[in-house]
Amino acid sequence: MSDVTLARLFRHMEWANQQLFAQLSALPEAALSFSAWNPDWTVGKLANHIAIAQGRLISRVEKSQAPEEIEAPLTSQGIKDLAKKVAANDKRMQELLNTPDEMRTFIRYGEEVSYLTSTIMAQFVHHATEHRAQIADILAANNMDVVNLDDIDLWSFERSERN
């Protein structure tokens, strides 16, 4: 299933995730508790959710048991540790890019569902992108406009690869 575009998307996602987590680890720890439209979804909760969901998605591709879902502490060190977990997950999914595109059956929201491997892999990239944007928005809504999504887009990624 792998091709040059797909590989680039996954490398970009890995890079963008690390850029975001580096920024989050440098913020005042209080910022990790910021929320906006939904008080349950804080910056720290979303950061944890990226890593937890990655583990689930990898297990679906591998047809294995999902890893235990443990949230990292909402501290600078907790975010640094989470960044390592996300990096390992990103690398693992990239190793799986040549997995055959076939139906995978698993439990989602308590129901048995089936999706193609390619859909699960596309969701891996989309999910991280979606939540990086939400984190940037929440921080901006709390007068901390520190994550510029243009700085972690594909154009910026290519420039970083050239340097």
Feature map (PLM): residue ranges:
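Active-site rim elements
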Residues: 3-9, 79-80
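Short, contiguous alpha-helical
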Residues: 7-71, 111-163
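Helix-adjacent hinge/juxtasegments
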Residues: 59, 63-100
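Acidic catalytic patch
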Residues: 97-111
